[in-house]
């Protein structure tokens, strides 16, 4: 995460270039809006607009002080981010849906792996087959089932070890 431009491929061709950099406080509104929009697209039956106030508190009080947040920016616009805490827990991987299917998400996961050389754990909604397949392609393994303590939804625990 050095501010270098990272080309992202889609089907073998370079489609866009992104700058990966550390999160800045000025990114808060864009990051929260991106979180809401992408989760709403992934789970249209859930009212994520109603959760924005809760998410802003969680973002400010839990993630920003305790995790490395790496953002991907294209032409000055936030296109994605990943959070990784010192224990190697990946809480959020958020990518603008316009870049779903590109290599942007795996580029962000690779940045998280650099921050967590001993390994990464994460929870993924059990009904999110697309995300599960993505994490498997990134080298993660399933390591059990659980229930998300916040949403009550069934989740899979996944781990990556170097």
Where are these regions (language model features)?
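A short, internal acetyl-CoA/4′-phosphopantetheine-binding micro-motif in the GNAT/acyltransferase core
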Residues: 90-100, 124-125
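Conserved acetyl-CoA-binding loop-helix of GNAT-fold acetyltransferases
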Residues: 95, 101-114, 133-137
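Conserved active-site alpha-helix within GNAT-family acetyltransferase domains
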Residues: 106, 127-144, 150-153
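Conserved GNAT acetyl-CoA-binding A-motif
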Residues: 115-127
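Conserved beta-strand in the GNAT
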Residues: 71, 77-94
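A short helix-loop-beta-strand connector motif used in the catalytic cores of GNAT acetyltransferases and
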Residues: 58-71, 89
């Amino acid at each position: 995460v050095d501010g270098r431009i990272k080309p992202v491929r889609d089907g073998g061709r370079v489609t866009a270039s992104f700058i990966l950099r550390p999160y800045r406080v000025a990114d808060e509104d864009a990051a929260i809006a991106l979180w809401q929009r992408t989760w709403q697209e992934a789970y249209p039956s859930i009212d994520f607009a109603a959760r924005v106030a809760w998410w802003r508190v969680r973002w400010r009080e839990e993630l920003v002080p305790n995790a490395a947040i790496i953002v991907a920016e294209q032409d000055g616009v936030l296109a994605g981010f990943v959070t990784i805490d010192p224990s190697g827990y990946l809480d959020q991987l958020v990518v603008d849906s316009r870049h779903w299917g590109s290599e942007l998400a795996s580029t962000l996961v690779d940045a998280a792996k650099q921050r967590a050389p001993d390994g990464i754990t994460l929870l993924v909604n059990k009904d999110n087959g697309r995300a599960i397949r993505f994490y498997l392609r990134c080298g993660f393994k399933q390591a059990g089932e659980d229930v998300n303590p916040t949403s009550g939804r069934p989740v899979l625990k996944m781990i990556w070890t170097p």
